[in-house]
Structure formats: C-alpha cells, structure tokens
C-alpha cells in the first residue's frame, strides 16, 4: 500500500476498493466478466470536514484506514499514482465495518 500524494478537500474521501473472493463458498470460480465491482473499501485519505451554516468546521466520522461500505454507484473513479481509486463524499458511505 503506497502513500498517495493527494489530499481531498472538505467532506470528500478517497477509497481503495477491496477485492472480493474469486471463489464461491461452494468452490465455484467466478470469472472476471461475471464479478460485480466491490462495494467495500478502505479509506486512503479524508478531507478536513464540511462547514455548517454557522461556518464551523464539522470533522468527518471516517479516517484513513477505516473499512467502509458504499453504494454501487457511489463516487467518481480516478487514477492517482497509477492506482484506481474512488473519490466520494462522506454522505455516500453507508457505514464503517468493524
């Protein structure tokens, strides 16, 4: 896991997808063409937070290293340092795993 030279702004979060198993519990191998994109990932970087109506900074609940679940269509796919990552708002994250 290489350090990325990117700092998201405001309430945005950079997430690395966590690949799912290539085999089912019954031992059937799933080809790449039949796999869905994983909806679980690891937070790589997080912004400082959003501002409320009064202008006060509201920090994010997630931090680098957190394992998160997100919606199937959440985020924008980007390539940073040769690695495919997602940038999404914290509100697109459904929850923290563990």
Swiss-Prot record:
Swiss-Prot/TrEMBL GO biological process terms: chaperone cofactor-dependent protein refolding
Record keywords, A-Z: Chaperone, Cytoplasm, Stress response
Subcellular location: Cytoplasm
InterPro entries to which the protein is assigned, alphabetical: Chaperonin_GroES, Chaperonin_GroES_sf, Chaprnonin_Cpn10_CS, GroES-like_sf
One GO cellular component, as annotated: cytoplasm
Residue stretches spanning the membrane: none
Keyword Cell membrane: no
GO molecular function, one term: unfolded protein binding
One Pfam family matching this protein: Cpn10
Induction: By heat shock.
Chief place of localization: cytoplasm
Record's function text: Together with the chaperonin GroEL, plays an essential role in assisting protein folding. The GroEL-GroES system forms a nano-cage that allows encapsulation of the non-native substrate proteins and provides a physical environment optimized to promote and accelerate protein folding. GroES binds to the apical surface of the GroEL ring, thereby capping the opening of the GroEL channel.
Assembly with partners or alone: Heptamer of 7 subunits arranged in a ring. Interacts with the chaperonin GroEL.
Family, per entry: Belongs to the GroES chaperonin family.
PANTHER family per UniProt: 10 KDA HEAT SHOCK PROTEIN, CO-CHAPERONIN GROES
Identification of the protein by name: Co-chaperonin GroES
Organism: Brucella abortus (strain S19)
Lineage, highest ranks first: Bacteria, Pseudomonadati, Pseudomonadota, Alphaproteobacteria, Hyphomicrobiales
Gene that this sequence comes from: groES
């Amino acid at each position: 896991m290489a350090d990325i030279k990117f700092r998201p702004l405001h309430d945005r979060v950079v997430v690395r997808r966590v690949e799912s198993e290539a085999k089912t519990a019954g031992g059937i191998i799933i080809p790449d063409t039949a796999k869905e994109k994983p909806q679980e990932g690891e937070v790589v970087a997080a912004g400082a937070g959003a501002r409320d109506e009064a202008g006060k900074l509201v920090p994010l609940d997630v931090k680098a290293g957190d394992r998160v679940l997100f919606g199937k269509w959440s985020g924008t796919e980007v390539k940073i340092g040769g690695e495919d990552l997602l940038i999404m708002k914290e509100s697109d994250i459904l929850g923290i795993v563990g």
